[in-house]
Structure formats: C-alpha cells, structure tokens
From Swiss-Prot:
Pfam families: Aldedh. It comes from Pseudomonas entomophila (strain L48). It catalyses: N-succinyl-L-glutamate 5-semialdehyde + NAD(+) + H2O = N-succinyl-L-glutamate + NADH + 2 H(+). This is N-succinylglutamate 5-semialdehyde dehydrogenase. The keyword Transferase does not apply. The active site is at E244, C278. Keywords: Arginine metabolism, NAD, Oxidoreductase. Its EC number is 1.2.1.71. Catalyzes the NAD-dependent reduction of succinylglutamate semialdehyde into succinylglutamate.
Length: 487
C-alpha cells in the first residue's frame, strides 16, 4: 500500500488506520494507515536534505518544474475532478472548476513572486542597494477538505517556487485527492524530498506541527485548529505561521431594484459548495418592512427548489453533500439548538436520507434569539437578521470575532463607500457574491479569521523573507573618514 510519499518513495503507513468515504453512498474511496511520528520525522529530514539543492536552482528552473506540474494536472483533469467529487461530494461541474484553479495557480504564483518577492536594486552613494528574497527552508502545509486540491495548492506552489521544501499533511477526509496531486508533482519531475506527503489525522498533525525541523507552517482550516496552532507557536518568532481560517460572514441587503438578482446572489453566497466555503454568507441582514418580507419570501421559494444530489448525478445538481454524515448531523443539531432558543424556521434544513450527507438549504430567522452564537456553521444554514436602519445593519455585521468576508447588495454607491469604510473584514464585496474571489487579489481576514498572513496573490509574502544588501565589487576607504579615526 502506497500511502505516503517520503524522500522520493511511496511508502505504507505505520500509524492509525484511515479510510475516506463517499459522503452520499458511504462507499470506501481510499484506505491506508497514517504516518506515525517516525515517518513524519523522516519526511522533515528528507525535505531538509533536499532544500539546499532545490533552493540553489535558478528561478527559471523551478518555474519549469511548476509548469510541468500544471501540464500534468491538465492531462489528468478529468480523473482529478472525479476524485474530488467522489471524496468530497461536490458536483462534477464544481470539481472541474477546482482543477482549473489548480492549473492556473502556477502562472498566477509566478506573476506574484516576480511582483512581490523578486529582486530589485538601485544606486546608493558608493554602493548598490539590493533587495532579494530567500526561502524559509522546510515548511509544513496543512490542507482542508472543502477544496482539497486548490487550497493546499495555494500554499505548496508559491512555497516551492520560492525555493522551500514542503511536508504536506492533507485533511484525513480527502487523502485520495492529495495522493493524485502528489503523483502529478512526481510525474512533473520534482526532485525527491522537495515535496513529501504524510497522510493522517490528529496524531500525524500534532507530530508535524511540533517537529523542531520545520521552519514554518501554512494552514487553511477551522478557527478551532488554527487557534491551537497559534498557541503552539507562541514564543517561536523564528517560525513563520500563516493561518487562513473561517468566518461568520455577514451579507447586508439594501432595498435594491432587482429582487431576483439579489436572491440569486444570496444563494450563490450562502449555498454554493453546500455552504462549505469559508467565505459563505452565514448571516443575512435584511431591512424590516414589506420590501424585506418580499425578498425573504422569494429567497425561500427559490431555495426550496434548489437541486441537491450526488456528485455525478445527471442533470447536475447545484449542491452536493457536506463532507460527512458527522458534519451533516452536527449542522442539524446546530439548527435545532437555534430553533430551541427562539429562531423561526423559514425553510428548515433537512437530511432527506439518513445514510447520506445530503442536506437541503436551511434559512432561519434568528432576529429574536438572545445571545446568538458567534460561530461558523459550515454548511447550508443561513441565519436571517432583520435591521431597522443601515447603521444598525453595519453594527450587526461587525458583531463578530471573525473578519473574513462581508458584502453589501445595494444600488447606492454612497452606501457602499460607507459600508466599506466601517466593515472589519479582509474581503468586502459590493453586489457580488461573497464566495467570489479575484486571482490577482489577496485572500484572508482579520480577527479570528487569520493572523494577517493573507494567501492567494499575497502567499508569496509568507513563502520568502526579504534580504537587504549594500554591495560594491571592491573594498576602498571612503573619501572622508569618520571623526576620531586616523589611518
């Protein structure tokens, strides 16, 4: 069994037994054993040994390997999309867009590296001032399950481009996607040890995060795990830690002319990927009164007809499943708890089949709920809050420990400027879905959503550190000596 990729070799695991399941059928997709602490150590050592050679390659040589990787992804795009769909439950049309994002990440990362962490020089008195960047060394990448190809890729590609070597621990829920991705790297000619794959759950993650041989850790996932990592790295300024976590994201709706456009944008913000994007709208702020009532009624009517089904269902569904039966049950429990506290079900989220992680969209009015939990419910559950005036809406939007994404649907530019100025979030959109992102922009948040290490286009910033140099080819005395020195 070839579960892990360490020092250029596919190896069986020596840790706990693992398997991934299709969330709808519960069929076994992948089986193996996780990496124990010894195998994690071997992976870190392999990366350390490979680092000098990889870092000393020219930038163009590293780009060549990355471009070959993009080519391998294209060649196996259909296989990879099927694997993503099978393991996560997301529809094939959406899985295919994820593979496209993986391919495009290479060119975007090269552009970002040249722009943000390239080399610059200029004259300074009798020397040349030069700014260059160096890789950190060996970095760990922890991947999430919701975009098991694209999101780890967003750390791995810029890290390798900068000259780092990587130990990659994917989510234990999506090991097969990680295995296929690493196969593409191997086929692209990446030297042994430059990228190492260690599969596993908590045991593997704890061993990797605590390994003294890593120079940094790049994480995308839940705030709970991210906070634990932040505590673990406290007092270690020698290690770079990049955290991209979740959010309790608000979408504020003003009285717009095009009601259906608002409804469609809300659905794309709240229910795409079965609500499993970190930028999904969790709270919908709607004005009190007749217009708000009509918006909510239209939203409920359209959401009730949203197609939900298996990843390969035809015609294709809009929503697939959530990642697991456990996740589905936790979401239903969260809905029940809110309803028990006084929330009103406008469209109750349901689980049509007890043995499948398929959930229908849920919309609940929590306006009357005292002490609403400031949590990220990672699924198709949208909370509606009615507001009396625009300033109250902004205050409620900011009433969260998180700060990932916020959005406004409004026909007024003045209101958007006011909203943008007062919003506390790393992503602020106007009349666009919260789940949309530009490849040429950073991606990250403030507060409990991250530690100011924005990813995407700004990933280059945490993959290398700046080195400032004053240089001249010959050593010579200055024209004027410092007072008090005689030669």
């Amino acid at each position: 069994m070839t579960t892990h990729y360490i020092a250029g070799q596919w190896l069986a695991g020596q840790g706990e037994a693992l398997q991934s399941l299709n969330p709808v059928t519960q069929a076994v997709v992948w089986t193996g054993q996780g990496a124990d602490a010894g195998q994690v150590e071997a992976a870190v050592q392999a990366a350390r040994q490979a680092f000098p050679g990889w870092a000393s390659l020219s930038l163009e040589a590293r780009i060549g390997v990355l471009e070959a990787f993009a080519g391998k992804l294209k060649a196996r795009a259909e296989e990879l999309a099927h694997c993503i769909g099978e393991e996560t439950g997301k529809p094939l049309w959406e899985s295919a867009t994820e593979v496209t994002s993986m391919v495009n990440k290479v060119a975007i990362s090269v552009q970002s590296y040249r722009e943000r962490t390239g080399e610059k020089s200029g004259p300074l008195a009798d020397a040349t001032a030069v700014l260059r960047h160096k890789p950190h060394g060996v970095v760990a990448v922890f991947g999430p399950y919701n975009f098991p190809g694209h999101l780890p890729n967003g750390h791995i590609v810029p890290a390798l481009l900068a000259g780092n070597c990587v130990v990659f621990k994917p989510s234990e829920l999506t090991p097969k996607v990680a295995e296929l991705t690493v196969q593409c790297w191997v086929e692209a000619g990446l030297p042994a040890g430059v990228l190492n794959l260690v599969q596993g759950a908590r045991e593997t993650g704890v061993a990797l995060a605590a390994n003294p041989g890593i120079d940094g850790l790049f994480f995308t996932g839940s705030s709970r795990t991210g906070n634990l990592l932040h505590q673990q790295f406290a007092g270690r300024p020698d290690k770079i830690l990049a955290l991209e976590m979740g959010g309790n994201n608000p979408l504020v709706v003003d009285e717009v002319k095009d009601l259906d456009a608002a409804v469609y944008t809300i659905i794309q913000s709240a229910f795409i990927s079965a609500g499993q994007r970190c930028t999904c709208a969790r709270r919908l702020l709607v004005p009190q009164g007749a217009w708000g009532d009509s918006l909510i009624q239209r939203l409920v009517d359209v959401s009730r007809s949203i197609s939900v089904g298996a990843f390969d269902q035809q015609p294709a569904p809009f929503m697939g499943s959530v990642i697991s039966l456990q996740a589905a049950r936790a979401l239903l429990a969260a809905q029940a708890e809110l309803l028990g506290k006084g929330a009103v079900a406008l469209l109750e989220m349901t689980q049509p089949q007890a043995d499948a992680a398929l959930l229908t969209p849920g919309i609940i009015d929590v306006t009357a709920v005292a002490g609403r939990p400031d949590e990220e419910f990672f699924g198709p559950l949208l909370q509606v809050i009615r507001y009396a005036d625009f300033d109250a809406a902004i205050e409620e939007a900011n009433n969260t420990q998180y700060g990932l994404a916020a959005g406004l649907l409004s026909d007024s530019n003045a209101r958007y400027q006011h909203f943008w100025l007062r919003s506390r979030a790393g992503i602020v959109n106007w009349n666009k879905q919260l789940t949309g992102a530009a490849s040429s922009a950073p991606f990250g948040g403030v507060g409990a959503s991250g530690n100011h290490r924005a990813s995407a286009y700004y990933a280059a910033d945490y993959c290398a550190y700046p080195v400032a140099s004053l240089e001249t080819a010959s050593l010579a005395l200055p024209a004027t000596l410092t007072p008090g020195v005689t030669l």
